[in-house]
Design a protein with these regions (language model features):
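Short, intrinsically disordered low-complexity segments
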Residues: 13-68
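Short, compact, well-ordered microdomains
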Residues: 64-92
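Short proline/glycine- and acidic-rich turn/helix-capping motifs at secondary-structure junctions
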Residues: 36-45, 87-97
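Short amphipathic beta-strand/extended segments with alternating polar/hydrophobic composition
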Residues: 50-53, 72-75, 96
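Terminal, regulation- and interaction-focused segments at domain boundaries
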Residues: 1-14
């Protein structure tokens, strides 16, 4: 499910390093990559929040389930970045209705 979309003026590939540096300062288990698309995964036990451009030209904040793990990531990102937080999470095309 998609919970929010980040807003920034530059191409996502130019924004990746800034986003990654910020996330690393606030979360201990982070995986990332930039090759064609940008992704940052924040891992906490069994929970994972993805911030990626796999289906968008801007970074989307995603997780299979809603919960405190998603809220924590959104609240942390809002400290520095502009986000459009969806009132109701949106399903991705590959997710069952």
């Amino acid at each position: 499910m998609v919970f929010a979309e980040m807003e920034y003026p530059q191409h996502y590939s130019e924004f990746h390093a800034e986003l990654l540096a910020f996330v690393h300062r606030h979360f201990s288990r982070v995986e990332s990559g930039l090759q064609g698309d940008s992704y940052v995964w924040i891992l906490d036990g069994e929970d994972k929040v993805a911030i990626d451009t796999f289906t968008s030209m801007k970074h989307l904040i995603k997780s299979p389930t809603a919960g405190a793990h998603v809220q924590k990531v959104i609240e942390t990102l809002l400290q520095r970045f502009k986000l459009h937080v969806y009132q109701t999470p949106e399903r991705e095309a590959h997710e069952d209705a």
